[in-house]
A protein has these predicted regions:
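Conserved donor-binding/catalytic core segment of Leloir-type glycosyltransferases
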Residues: 6, 168-185, 191-198, 206-210
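Extended catalytic core of nucleotide-activated donor transferases of GT-like folds
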Residues: 6-8, 47-141
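Acidic anion/phosphate-binding donor-loop and adjacent secondary structure
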Residues: 117-118, 155-172
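Donor nucleotide-sugar binding/catalytic pocket of nucleotide-sugar-dependent glycosyltransferases
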Residues: 127-138, 145-162
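Nucleotide-activated donor-binding/catalytic signature segment of Leloir-type glycosyltransferases, i.e.
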Residues: 219-264
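Acidic donor-binding loop of glycosyltransferase active sites
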Residues: 268-285, 298
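Short hydrophobic beta-strand element within catalytic cores of glycosyltransferases
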Residues: 299-302, 316-319
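A charged, aromatic-enriched C-terminal amphipathic alpha-helix characteristic of glycosyltransferases
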Residues: 339, 343-344, 352-384
Length: 387
């Protein structure tokens, strides 16, 4: 008999962890196994249909929250339950570490590859570990961890149903880049490549969704060989992305900052794009934004490193194979890759000049993601991996 599952992080539709929790909960509800939510779900950040399905879980959440409040800082052991804990780099748990079950499973997508004795000790307290990339699983195997579960994240095909282009960007060749600004995401590489590409193709337009809910974490991008400084933080607490792009030689008429995109906006924006670029230095999972672009039928350029390798198939994207090592003085960046600006420019030019080949690539990518990388498939394999 299956144990009850307890999700200890916040469900939402605004970031990866929230989506992992939400789609796991929806799957469990379909299996008539409602999960216990230890954290209050962010219902305001859910589409109405999903909100309606999650709301009935609030009653049990409020009961466990009241018990937790009465217990103060004590460990809460939930007998007969499997507790899933979301872990950060270094296997650092959040406040939910106080919830433990008959089985406690650690869920992680990590980019920091340094494993000292303290990290290994924290990892060993879990009855099982589940990751979201072959890259992470292999790194754990090197450290002696066996039986690590693997579940690939995905997309919701209904949410990303094909929509016709609106023509909002006119006759421009539109390049999309998404993901919060930080060193490992490689927005500096995007700017360097786009600046050169636009010199060849003056009708090119870079459309970005780079805002970072934790703007101070963007400071590390100053380590880049392509940029002298990170974007400034404005008085409103948001990154001054347009100014940063201008400082890198991208003219105002070739750059649009879309701000923070809502889930309902993604498909419509991507319908007007001709390419999506992801020269990321590292992905602990498989890059949700890249999969969304593929699902919407946009030809995608992907760095061939870390978690991206689980997305790359023959013909379904244009991989950036020229990968150089990223400086790694302390062993925290094993497997990270520095993409070639020149190769990225070449791939963009190929998509520009051969639209038929671009369409074939887009269709291969769309078929792959919609067939093999859905949230439904993720949730099924995730629950199996947990149990």
């Amino acid at each position: 008999m299956h144990q009850n599952l307890v999700l200890t992080w916040q469900l939402s539709e605004i970031h990866g962890w929230g989506l992992v929790g939400l789609h796991t909960a929806l799957y469990l509800l379909d299996q008539e196994r409602p999960p216990l939510l230890a954290d209050l779900p962010l219902l305001s950040a859910m589409r109405p249909a999903n909100r309606a399905r999650i709301e009935p879980l609030l009653e049990a959440h409020h009961r466990i929250a009241a018990i937790a409040q009465q217990a103060g800082d004590k460990i809460l052991r939930l007998e007969g339950a499997t507790v899933l804990q979301a872990l950060g780099n270094g296997f650092i748990p959040g406040a939910a570490a106080r919830f433990q079950g008959s089985r406690t499973v650690g869920v992680i997508a990590f980019e920091n590859t340094a494993f000292d004795a303290a990290v290994r000790e924290r990892a060993r307290v879990y009855d099982r570990i589940v990751v979201h990339s072959t890259y992470n699983r292999d790194l754990l195997a090197e450290q002696g961890f066996t039986g690590v579960g693997l579940a690939f994240q995905g997309v919701d095909p209904e949410e990303l149903a094909p929509v016709p282009p609106t023509g909002r960007f006119g006759n421009r060749f539109v390049v999309f880049s998404g993901g919060k600004i930080e060193f490992r995401k490689g927005q500096d590489i995007v700017l360097a490549a786009f600046r050169r590409f636009r010199e060849r193709r003056p009708d090119a337009l870079l459309v970005t969704a780079w805002h970072n809910y934790w703007p101070s974490s963007s400071a590390g991008i100053a380590e880049s060989p392509h940029t002298p400084a990170p974007p400034a933080i404005g008085e409103n607490g948001r990154l001054r992305i347009v100014e940063w792009a201008m400082a890198h030689g991208v003219p105002p008429d070739a750059f649009i900052d879309m701000g923070i995109l809502g889930r309902e906006q993604i498909a419509a924006i991507l319908a007007d794009c001709h390419a999506a670029v992801f020269p990321n230095r590292c992905e602990g999972a498989t890059n949700l934004v890249a999969m969304e672009a593929m699902a919407c039928g946009v030809p995608v350029i992907l760095s061939a490193n870390t978690g991206h390798l689980d997305l790359i198939r023959e013909g379904n994207c244009l991989p950036l194979r020229r990968q150089s090592p990223v400086p790694d003085p302390d062993g925290s960046r094993r497997g990270w890759g520095e993409s070639s600006v020149e190769e990225l420019v070449e791939h963009l030019d190929r998509l520009y000049t051969d639209r038929a080949a671009a369409r074939r690539c887009a269709e291969e990518g769309r078929a792959f993601v919609r067939g093999e990388r859905t949230w439904r498939a993720f949730a099924r394999s995730f629950v199996e991996a947990v149990e």
